């Protein structure tokens, strides 16, 4: 195998050539030796000298070089050393080359003359103009010239000849093949054989048209810069850095030229970043300097990548070849897409073909195929670390565009920029045959080139393969990708090539060869390492060397031919082919090889056959290698082999071109190999990133794609277009393009096939020789064998001929490949030289500008200095003149100043004298003034002392006077206090006597009557109680019960005269028409109609006729809850009291007096043995009104069970709303609330309840005489309007109650009598008052509070609903109210009162005893004549006059009311604003504060007050709302219920006894009651809410008032009405005091649930009721221990306290 004929340089030699100084010197020397003519003709290639002169200086000479060319050259030398197999003469050649390079460097350092620069620039401009024109013509038809023949004829003769000679012949039809064999060199035959190849080249060239167009837009010759000395390193560097844009023009992919399809980023670095388009001098750093380097493999890869980038192709094939060769050299930096990169860097090209250059100067977009190839290239490049050392960043400014020359490169670049992925990169494009249009200029494309076509890159190969594109866009784009189509460009490149010296050419070829070889080796390193493959690699390398050596010879011969042709002026035929190198192919505008279509059509069938043959061979070969190679390798071989075989078959016919068969074969093989290597290298770059196996697989995958892209070409299986497939996708141009794209797989396959063919041919030769020997030895053993042998020989000869033809074709293919690669390299070198020239020119211009600027600056400085000096002189002259003037002026001024100074001195002297004189005077004045001030201060001090003394004396005097006055006042107060006490004591004694006398008289008078009435009433009440119990439900509904009539006492009539007798609380419940009554029980609220009905009913009943008690009547309920049937008056039996006088309920058998006149109802409750204790009304007002219980205030029998159905006399004084009515539903029928006689339960009327609480049956206080006058606490005026009717009291009325306090029957005035209407409109307005029936149902129906006032004082039937107020017990007399208080029947107050009073904070006068009350009234307002002691004052009811039994000494409270004349003088009690019981009943509203019931109904002494309604009663410490005046009888806890003194919170609003704390008017609501704010009775010791004291029974103790309401709610009415009121009335004060009366059986919050009025019946507070009853017995939590029930009456067992009523 022939070895490389090119000398190889040793590393040392190469290193010696590297240093920039030597390179520059060599370039300079070369420049001098080869001066170009001043104006070479543009169309005609310049003469060799001019071309030589045009050689570019070494890039290293550029001052912009960024790389050390020494190191680069050194590394390149190392690479060469590794790869080279050169002989010793190579070193000599390199030495010579180095010498030339040194000369060039020296020349480069020398400045060029302007003339030479201008000539060079003009020549270049002409060259570029021609190229541009050609490209425009080519680009005129985007689809390419339809008629290839026309295009072919348009080519210059020398190009056609070159194409004919250079292009290998493919497989032809038998006739054509025979003709070809006969005359292989015949131009026509060659033309016919190469048409397919040309078509392939044209189509591949289309891929570079875009780039070329761009290049033409910035043609290298358009700049005025002088050429630089030639340096082969330029080409090496360009080849190594194909991806770096040539400084000649902006790369299509640059950002500046944002060509849509610009996938080539190589130029991007140049144009976008460091270097502007070549048409403009770069204003930014230029591309890195180019380093010549023999290893072009990498650069080839880069150029291949550029080809992949489509847009990077530069029209000149030289540049592509150089780039491809450079890329083939592993040691060099890759110039993918003109991006100069270090070999070691990752050179994987981006989709735009940019390698990942460290600088990052790469386009962002690439075709997918490029990406793959770039990846492979990157991997391959990574292996070329040495390339980094070889990179010389020569940033040559792009030449300014020559105005004369249009930018033809625009067309070229646009063609080159075809974005089809497969399209060759700029280098690949350069390697593709230059398209040539000699005719017609097509309009230049814009600089950006083609519109973007993402698919164009992929289709470029196929389109380039065809004269017609597989897709219109693809062909158009392909046409635009190639920028070397300009014939002028080719001419200029040719001139440049011819201008090079032989050594330069050799060096370029050597660099190209080494680059390709390196790339091939890199590609092979991924292949199998078996021995077979190793031998194949060796064969390939040898084949490559041989091919390149042969190609160099061809180059020389071709160059010589060209030179001769040029020198001859066309007398001799031009060299074959378009040039400038053997094998160059011209492409039409569509990228198809000029004239390729006819040939391709004629050869299509032959190609198909050859392809099939090839495949057969390929498969055989593939199988052979399959065992040793990876599958990828197998595929790679499989596809490549067909084409190489085809090529070899066609190459051998070409062997007659003056090349040995071997040489041709090698050349073709190498051409194939080289082409394949180029392609392989490109693919290899992709494969580097892919796996080694994928390298082949990718190639296999790409093969079909290119075949698809190259539709219309020969069978896609024919990889390289060898033989019959010149036009297929795998054509040699494609191989070159791939190689330029750093994809050397195809090239490697081609070379492998070539090598295999050569080996096969040698084997055949050896076999033939051996066979001939064998035949000689074994000749003729058998004729048949001889015949067979002959046939075999013939076949072998045919095969040999075919093989020779293929070898010849392979040689031609390699020529095309090498031409493509070399064109690219030379083009790169040429452009680099131009760039360097431009750069140097720019630098020179810059230096000139700097020098000029410096000169101008110097001139400016000089002029400025002169001006400054002049100005300075002027300033100095002026300054001197000024100084002179200043001196003169200063002298004059000095003289003047001297004179002035003298004058000033004299003046100062004068002034000083004057000042001294004035100072002396001033001092004298100051001394005098100081003396005066001192005197004045002294006088002032003395004056102050005098004043202080006077003041002290005055204060002493005043103090003395004050003390004396105080002593006098104290003495006076003492005297007055003593007198007052004495008077009070006297008055008290007198009152006590009077009361006692009166009580005795009344009792005596009433005793018989009451006794009689009591019995009758007891019977009636028993009956009524039974009826009420049965009708409890109906009573709750307000259904009136049949009233029980009772005897009417004349006294009651009399009382009624003043105040209409309390309407009898017959079984019929007086329904209060006011707001629904709040029943203590379930039926707390009743429509007013009910109350009004009750009141009406009660009014209808004649006095003494008990209204029918509703089953729900409070008294009935109480009685029921007491468990004592209403008829159980047996307990009442035993009362020794005389029959009550008329007007009072008849006494029960226990001598409870029944007021005959006031109420006809008879107390069915017989006073128990304990009747001596005053009992709170058993009828609880507050729950549902119990009509069954006519409220009868009176201390009837306490038996709770006994319902005192004492019909109250319905006689009412006008305006008395209180008429005896059945208790309202205010008290729930007992059926609903059986156990507690709460409001919810039917209860006996208050009075009844008072006497009828369970367990209290036996507890009966002796009835008090009802002789109390009707002055009643409410006054006889109807202020209470008989709101309080205590049927038991002669005239059931608060007045009666209060007045009868002495007897505690409080019958003085029936509640219905006007006495109760203490002017309290509330009562008259049906405000139920406890125990009062007011025609006006109050919000609190006192009726519900059945006899809350049914304290013994009077039945408290509220208006309407007040019926309950009317104690169903016999009137107070019946129920013997005082018996509740512990008063014995005979005594005005039972002796038990003291027991009660034992717990009272202050002594209480005996209730009902006139004298005691007198004493009490001493503290009461005098106007309250209705005080308990003064019961007679206004009470019109006649009392029985029976005196109460003896009053044990020390006994206070109700027991003090006993008949004993001896009056226990109570200790001074707190002055209460409330009137005494019964006193001042007529006060404001019920008699403000003074009524027995405490703060009257209206104001202070309302019934509620004294009666507990207002809490003004003695027992309510907090009368009404006035907590400050606790009555002595009631510990000071007014549950905070009604206003003091109001019966509830005024009997006015609430019925009597309803002290409603809540807003609910009625007893218990303060203010709402009759008199909300009456001052508390002196006796009122407990809060009104708490009728905890026994007196509560009397006064219906009323903190809560009669219905001392719950604290929060209205205090329950009298006797628990309040408590239960709490339910209907403002929540009963249950929480605090049980509803005092305990009548509040209704659920009151006071007692717990309301039933517990303090006094269940009088809040008897049976145990279990959370409250203590009025008597303090447990059962009412609020009951104060001193309650009557607890202490007052020893006979009253606490158990008897109505606990049931307290819920």
From Swiss-Prot:
Transmembrane segments: none annotated. The lineage of its organism: Eukaryota, Fungi, Dikarya, Basidiomycota, Ustilaginomycotina. The gene is NST1. This is Stress response protein NST1. PANTHER family: LD36051P (PTHR31780:SF10), STRESS RESPONSE PROTEIN NST1-RELATED (PTHR31780). Residues 384-393, 691-703, 853-866, 874-896, 904-1023 have a biased composition (Basic and acidic residues). Residues 37-48, 274-288, 396-409, 572-581, 1138-1148 have a biased composition (Pro residues). Residues 1-91, 243-288, 347-484, 566-724, 759-807, 843-1292, 1353-1407, 1424-1465, 1516-1537, 1558-1581, 1595-1637, 1672-1703 are annotated as: Disordered. Residues 1598-1619 have a biased composition (Gly residues).
């Amino acid at each position: 195998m022939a070895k490389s004929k090119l000398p190889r340089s040793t590393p040392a030699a190469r290193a010696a050539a590297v240093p920039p100084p030597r390179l520059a010197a060599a370039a300079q020397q070369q420049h001098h030796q080869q001066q170009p003519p001043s104006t070479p003709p543009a169309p005609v290639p310049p003469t060799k000298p001019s071309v030589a002169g045009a050689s570019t200086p070494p890039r290293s000479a550029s001052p912009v070089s960024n790389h050390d060319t020494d190191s680069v050259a050194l590394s390149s030398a190392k690479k060469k050393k590794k790869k080279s197999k050169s002989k010793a003469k190579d070193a000599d050649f390199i030495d010579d080359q180095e010498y030339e390079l040194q000369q060039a460097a020296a020349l480069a350092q020398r400045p060029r003359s302007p003339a030479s620069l201008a000539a060079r620039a003009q020549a270049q401009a002409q060259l570029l103009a021609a190229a541009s024109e050609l490209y425009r013509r080519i680009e005129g038809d985007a689809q390419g010239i339809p008629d290839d023949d026309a295009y072919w004829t348009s080519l210059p003769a020398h190009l056609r000849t070159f194409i004919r000679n250079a292009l290998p012949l493919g497989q032809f039809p038998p006739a054509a093949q025979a003709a070809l064999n006969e005359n292989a060199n015949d131009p026509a035959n060659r033309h016919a054989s190469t048409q397919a190849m040309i078509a392939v080249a044209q189509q591949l060239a289309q891929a570079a048209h875009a780039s070329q167009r761009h290049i033409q837009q910035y043609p290298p010759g358009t700049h005025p810069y002088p050429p630089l000395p030639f340096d082969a390193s330029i080409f090496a560097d360009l080849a190594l850095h194909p991806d770096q844009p040539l400084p000649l023009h902006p790369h299509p992919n640059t950002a500046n030229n944002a060509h849509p399809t610009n996938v080539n980023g190589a130029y991007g670095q140049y144009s976008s970043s460091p270097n502007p388009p070549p048409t403009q001098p770069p204003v930014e750093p230029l591309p890195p300097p180019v380093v010549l380097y023999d290893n072009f493999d990498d650069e080839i890869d880069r150029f291949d990548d550029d080809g992949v980038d489509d847009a990077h192709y530069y029209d000149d094939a030289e540049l592509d070849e150089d780039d491809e060769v450079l890329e083939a050299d592993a040691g060099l930096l890759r110039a993918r897409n003109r991006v100069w990169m270090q070999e070691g860097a990752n050179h994987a090209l981006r989709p735009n073909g940019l390698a990942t250059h460290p600088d990052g100067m790469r386009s962002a977009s690439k075709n997918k195929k490029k990406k793959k190839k770039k990846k492979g290239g990157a991997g391959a490049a990574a292996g070329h670390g040495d390339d980094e050392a070889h990179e010389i960043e020569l940033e040559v400014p792009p030449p300014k565009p020559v105005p004369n020359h249009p930018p033809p490169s625009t067309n070229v670049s646009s063609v080159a920029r075809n974005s089809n992925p497969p399209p060759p990169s700029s280098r690949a494009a350069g390697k593709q045959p230059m398209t040539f249009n000699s005719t017609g200029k097509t309009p230049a494309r814009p600089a950006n080139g083609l519109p973007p076509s993402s698919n164009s890159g992929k289709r470029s190969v196929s389109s380039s393969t065809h004269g017609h594109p597989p897709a219109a866009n693809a062909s158009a784009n392909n046409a635009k990708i190639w920028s070397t189509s300009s014939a002028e460009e080719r001419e200029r490149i040719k001139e440049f090539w011819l201008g090079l010296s032989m050594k330069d050419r050799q060096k370029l070829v050597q660099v190209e060869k080494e680059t390709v070889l390196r790339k091939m080796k890199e590609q092979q390193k991924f292949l199998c390492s078996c021995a077979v493959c190793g031998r194949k690699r060796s064969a390939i390398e040898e084949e490559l060397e041989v091919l390149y050596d042969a190609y160099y010879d061809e180059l020389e011969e071709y160059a010589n031919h060209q030179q001769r042709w040029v020198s001859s002026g066309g007398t001799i035929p031009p060299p074959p082919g378009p040039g400038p190198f053997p094998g160059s192919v011209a492409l039409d505008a569509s990228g198809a090889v000029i004239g390729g279509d006819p040939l391709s059509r004629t050869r299509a069938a032959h190609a198909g056959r050859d392809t099939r043959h090839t495949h057969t061979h390929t498969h055989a070969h593939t199988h052979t290698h399959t065992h040793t190679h990876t599958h990828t390798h197998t595929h790679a071989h499989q596809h490549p082999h067909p084409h190489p075989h085809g090529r070899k078959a066609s190459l051998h016919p070409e062997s007659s071109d003056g090349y040995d068969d071997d040489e041709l074969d090698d050349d073709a093989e190498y051409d194939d190999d080289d082409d394949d290597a180029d392609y392989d290298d490109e693919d290899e770059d992709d494969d580097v990133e892919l796996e080694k196996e994928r390298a082949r697989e990718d190639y296999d995958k790409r093969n079909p794609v290119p075949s698809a892209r190259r539709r219309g070409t020969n069978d896609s299986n024919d990889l390289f277009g060898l033989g019959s497939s010149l036009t297929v996708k795998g054509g040699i141009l494609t191989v070159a393009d791939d190689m330029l794209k750093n994809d050397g797989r195809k090239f490697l396959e081609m070379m492998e096939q070539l090598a295999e063919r050569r080996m096969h041919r040698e084997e055949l030769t050896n076999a033939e020789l051996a066979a001939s020997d064998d035949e000689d030895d074994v000749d003729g053993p058998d004729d048949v064998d001889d015949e067979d042998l002959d046939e075999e020989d013939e076949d072998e000869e045919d095969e040999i001929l075919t093989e020779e033809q293929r070898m010849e074709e392979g040689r031609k293919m390699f020529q095309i490949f090498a031409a493509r690669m070399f064109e690219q390299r030379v083009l790169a070198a040429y452009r680099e030289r131009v760039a360097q020239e431009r750069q140097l020119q720019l630098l020179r211009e810059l230096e000139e500008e700097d020098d000029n600027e410096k000169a101008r600056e110097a001139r400016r400085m000089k002029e400025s200095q002169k001006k400054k000096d002049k100005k300075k002189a002027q300033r100095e002259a002026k300054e001197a003149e000024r100084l002179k003037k200043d001196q003169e002026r200063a002298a004059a001024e000095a003289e003047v100043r001297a004179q002035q100074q003298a004058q000033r001195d004299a003046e100062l002297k004068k002034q000083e004298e004057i000042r001294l004189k004035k100072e002396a005077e001033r001092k004298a004045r100051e001394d005098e003034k100081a003396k005066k001030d001192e005197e004045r201060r002294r006088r002032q001090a003395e004056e102050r002392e005098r004043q202080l003394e006077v003041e002290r004396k005055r204060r002493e005097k005043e103090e003395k006077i004050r003390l004396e006055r105080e002593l006098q006042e104290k003495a006076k107060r003492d005297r007055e206090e003593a007198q007052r006490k004495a008077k009070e004591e006297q008055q008290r004694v007198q009152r006590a006597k009077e009361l006692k006398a009166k009580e005795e008289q009344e009792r005596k008078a009433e005793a018989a009557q009451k006794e009689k009435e009591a019995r009758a009433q007891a019977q009636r009440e028993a009956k009524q109680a039974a009826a009420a119990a049965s009708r409890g439900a109906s009573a709750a509904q307000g259904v009136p019960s049949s009233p029980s009539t009772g005897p009417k006492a004349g006294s009651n009539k009399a009382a009624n005269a003043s105040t209409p007798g309390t309407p009898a609380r017959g079984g019929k419940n007086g329904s209060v028409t006011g707001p629904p009554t709040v029943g203590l029980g379930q039926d707390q609220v009743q429509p007013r109609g009910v109350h009004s009905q009750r009141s009406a009913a009660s009014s209808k009943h004649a006095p003494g006729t008990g209204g029918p008690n509703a089953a729900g009547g409070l008294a009935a309920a109480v009685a029921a809850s007491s468990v004592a049937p209403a008829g159980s008056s047996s307990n009442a039996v035993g009362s020794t009291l005389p029959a009550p006088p008329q007007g009072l309920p008849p006494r029960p058998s226990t001598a409870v007096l029944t007021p005959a006149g006031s109420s006809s109802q008879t107390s069915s409750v017989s006073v128990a043995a304990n009747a001596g204790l005053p009992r709170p009304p058993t009828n609880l007002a507050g729950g549902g009104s119990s009509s069954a219980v006519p409220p009868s205030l009176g201390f009837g029998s306490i038996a709770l069970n006994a319902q005192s159905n004492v019909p109250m006399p319905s006689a009412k004084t006008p305006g008395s709303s209180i008429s005896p009515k059945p208790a309202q539903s205010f008290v729930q029928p007992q059926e609903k609330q059986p156990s507690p006689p709460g409001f919810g339960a039917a209860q006996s009327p208050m009075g009844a309840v008072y006497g009828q609480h369970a367990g209290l049956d036996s507890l009966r206080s002796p009835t008090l005489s009802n002789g109390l006058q009707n002055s009643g606490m409410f006054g006889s005026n109807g202020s209470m309007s008989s709101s309080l009717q205590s049927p038991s009291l002669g005239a059931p009325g608060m007045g009666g109650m209060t007045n009868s306090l002495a007897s505690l029957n409080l019958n003085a005035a029936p509640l219905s009598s006007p006495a109760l209407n203490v002017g309290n409109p509330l009562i008259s307005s049906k405000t139920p008052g406890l125990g009062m029936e007011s025609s006006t149902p109050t919000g609190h129906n006192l009726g519900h509070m059945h006899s809350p006032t049914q304290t013994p004082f009077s039945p408290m039937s509220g208006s309407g609903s007040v019926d309950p107020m009317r104690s169903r017990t016999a009137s107070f007399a019946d129920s013997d109210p005082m018996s509740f208080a512990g008063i014995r029947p005979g005594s005005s107050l039972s002796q038990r009162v003291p027991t009660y009073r034992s717990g009272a904070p202050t002594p209480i006068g005996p209730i009902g005893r006139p004298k005691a009350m007198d004493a009490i009234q001493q503290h009461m307002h005098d106007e309250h004549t209705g005080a308990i002691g003064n019961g007679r004052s206004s009470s019109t009811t006649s009392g029985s006059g029976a005196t109460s039994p003896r009053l044990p000494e020390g006994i206070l409270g109700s027991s003090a009311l006993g008949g004993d004349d001896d009056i226990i003088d109570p200790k001074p009690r707190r002055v209460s604003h409330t009137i005494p019981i019964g006193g001042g009943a007529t006060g404001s509203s019920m008699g403000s504060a003074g009524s027995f019931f405490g703060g009257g109904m209206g104001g202070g002494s309302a019934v509620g007050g004294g009666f507990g309604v207002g809490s003004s009663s003695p027992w309510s410490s907090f009368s009404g709302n006035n907590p400050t005046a606790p009555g002595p009888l009631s510990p000071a806890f007014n549950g905070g219920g009604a206003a003091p003194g109001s019966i509830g919170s005024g009997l006015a609003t609430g019925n009597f006894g309803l002290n409603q704390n809540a807003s609910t008017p009625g007893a218990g609501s303060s203010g709402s009651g009759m008199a909300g704010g009456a001052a508390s009775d002196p006796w009122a010791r407990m809060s009104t809410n708490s009728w905890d004291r026994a007196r509560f029974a009397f006064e219906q103790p009323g903190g809560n008032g009669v219905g001392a309401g719950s604290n929060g709610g209205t205090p329950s009415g009298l006797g628990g009405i309040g408590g239960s009121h709490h339910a209907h009335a403002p929540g009963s004060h249950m929480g605090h005091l049980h509803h005092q009366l305990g009548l509040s059986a209704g659920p009151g919050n006071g007692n717990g649930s309301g039933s517990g009025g303090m006094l269940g019946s009088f809040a008897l507070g049976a145990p279990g009721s959370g409250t203590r009853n009025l008597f303090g017995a447990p059962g009412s939590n609020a009951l104060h221990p001193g309650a009557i029930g607890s202490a007052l009456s020893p006979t009253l067992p606490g158990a008897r306290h109505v606990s049931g009523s307290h819920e």
